[in-house]
Amino acid sequence: MAQILLHGTLHATIYEVDELHGGGGGNFFSKLKQNIEETVGIGKGVTKLYATIDLEKARVGRTRIIENETTNPKWNESFHIYCGHLASNIIFTVKDDNPIGATLIGRAYVPVSEVLDGHEIDKWVEILDTEKNPIEGGSKIHVRLQYFDVLKDRNWARGIRSPKYPGVPYTFFSQRQGCKVFLYQDAHVPDNFVPKIPLAGGKNYEAHRCWEDIFDAITNAKHLIYITGWSVYTEISLIRDSRRPKAGGDQTIGELLKKKASEGVRVLMLVWDDRTSVGLLKKDGLMATHDEETEQFFRDTDVHCVLCPRNPDDGGSIVQDLQISTMFTHHQKIVVVDSALPGGGGSDKRRIVSFVGGLDLCDGRYDTAFHSLFRTLDTAHHDDFHQPNFPGAAITKGGPREPWHDIHSRVEGPIAWDVLFNFEQRWRKQGGKDILAPLRELEDVIIPPSPVTFPDDHETWNVQLFRSIDGGAAFGFPDTPEDAAKAGLVSGKDNIIDRSIQDAYIHAIRRAKNFIYIENQYFLGSSFSWNNDDIKREEIGALHLIPKELSLKIVSKIEAGERFAVYVVVPMWPEGIPESSSVQAILDWQKRTIEMMYKDVVQALRAKGSDEDPRNYLTFFCLGNREVKKSGEYEPAEQPEPDSDYQRAQEARRFMIYVHTKMMIVDDEYIIIGSANINQRSMDGARDSEIAMGGYQPYHLANTQPARGQVYGFRMSLWYEHLGMLHDTFQRPESEECINKVNQIADKYWDLYSSESLERDLPGHLLRYPIGVASEGEVTELPGFEFFPDTKARILGAKADYLPPILTT
């Protein structure tokens, strides 16, 4: 049967199965139980029935488990499924769960052609065995389906049409109005980084300084300081710019937090407990998180620091539980404090302020837009030398260090309370003692959630909080699928999941009308659509929709004869030894993802009779730096190993700038910033825990003319950082002139970066991602570049036969 593209939203309900052991099949379950008892040795067998929904081989929904109901299991569960899949059938599978794996009972097939017209269908569908024959007793499953094509969505490709746009639907947190947002590029912005970027209303864009603001927020807190992190390192200092000193700025963050706790401030920290059983990755040079040191530092002090493992929700199998607790992390990076009212005028009243983004408060994160490799080794980075990509790298052997590019945000107003509530949910689940600040008792002091801007303030923001998290990490999630759905949560096989970050990305991409700009540490997913010549797609499981949504958006614009551009910035390779099998495996997934997208774009261009370069619509970059030697530079006492990547990079005076960002800008009007990568770990909801904000300024929308608010100013400031220049064409990123200009500059910078010799510093950091695109969209090596410069690491990656995909996707 021909496969048809389902691109839109599928509403599905699974009601029940009738008479599972009818027609003489009564011994079916007893045989099943006996078999399980023999293989697993668990005593008397118990049936644990659940049903799943697949679009071909892509799992898009699953019910809870119903125990000991062998004849007529009733789930009555509804699903809201975003889809971008080629499929001939919507497949309902009934299974009996085992401690290890599950036993197939049968599958029911609904042809995609039946739902295409958008009418609701409600029917009993025959359950078939693996040979497509009816199972014993002729059992049927009762389902309801209704498909809403993306073209019928009134927001499709129309941007945010009105200041009253209500935000992403079906989410745990609703959108908040009357908020303030500060956007941060890198941990610090020095005074000499001042691009002139005019905004609406005659203002110029002003940069903010993340770690200075976090230092001030912690220093001035009086009642509470809540921190979550993948890593928090007590030995780092937040203030390092000698031209911008602050009182107390020489303290480490550990000493600062101890001091605040001793003053009576409630300081609570949830730091990921790195269960070192992830040895597979550890030896490949992934950075230690200092979790044990951090806990030790605060032991027997007034700071409550809890090491927080990524515990599974209650409903998984033995294998799933093992995977979650040993392979996945707590990845949210937030700081929540109480703060003085703006322009407080001597008032004792306090409000809540929160920070959300990609920056952990740990070593290797402090950097500026200049991302120097060698010139800060005797100043800001002498005691914070971070280079996990070379074995044995150390300050004593010299640079290049690994520069760090990241993005963060500060949110004020009602949205800041949502971040606080997220912390409280997590603390109640895994924090141990109930020592959260008693907000009810403090209501005379801390004002309740309320707008911090007037409705007519042109700088106001509407902001929504999104997460990837499940009931294993957040307290108070509903128990039943019905209540979960009402709360904007997804129910799975006995776990309740908040997957709203993925939903937010999907909605923003579907709304986009002109361009999308992405910076992310990873870029892989939509594995259901990868080329499957040498892999079994269904075994990969990187099913999130983001890459496919991007390519389908471009395709729709090509078909409509309209311009659209997608710019993606990723690191050269994921942090770690680049030749290692884990890094090579991730690069292989990334290549397959990019290739899938380019094939979609090329196919659409060819269908229009165009042989245009697909890079005019979709283009990938990385960041790097290269510096000539200057007199007075730090001189290391030792040398790197001869003929090592380290030694070659030191001689060539170049290295990648690590892109750790997790950000997307749409049409210069909407921005998502958070901790979530574009991979399955971050977008799944039941893997790594994540948090993000999505927001826009209702007075700065891209309706009749291009948006010129803070989001535009921030993007232009980022482009100034990466390109070393501003140009008029950058104001219209969707235009062919702009994407050609950016591609040309990035191609030139790559040539300078990768050349044998260097006459002067690299004029900018944005480099072409070193891959080619062949005539049918296949991703190929750039001529002469099988390996990243100074390494023996293949740019296109390599399949890892012994690493399970769940670890690297």
From Swiss-Prot:
Keyword annotations of the record: Calcium, Hydrolase, Lipid degradation, Lipid metabolism, Metal-binding, Repeat
Residues reported to bind a 1,2-diacyl-sn-glycero-3-phosphate: 331, 521, 660
Domain PLD phosphodiesterase, residue spans: 326-365, 655-682
Enzyme class per UniProt: hydrolase
UniProt-listed Gene3D superfamilies: C2 domain, Endonuclease Chain A
PROSITE patterns named among the record's database cross-references: C2, PLD
Reaction(s) the record says it catalyses: a 1,2-diacyl-sn-glycero-3-phosphocholine + H2O = a 1,2-diacyl-sn-glycero-3-phosphate + choline + H(+)
SMART domains named in the record: C2, PLDc
Listed GO biological process terms: phosphatidylcholine metabolic process; phospholipid catabolic process
Gene Ontology MF terms in the entry: calcium ion binding; phospholipase D activity
Enzyme Commission code: 3.1.4.4
GO cellular component labels: plasma membrane
Domain C2: 1-125
A Pfam family per the record: PLDc
Stored InterPro entries: C2_dom (IPR000008), C2_domain_sf (IPR035892), PLipase_D/transphosphatidylase (IPR001736), PLipase_D_C (IPR024632), PLipase_D_fam (IPR015679), PLipase_D_pln (IPR011402)
Keyword Calcium: yes
Family recorded in the similarity comment: Belongs to the phospholipase D family. C2-PLD subfamily.
Protein name: Phospholipase D alpha 1
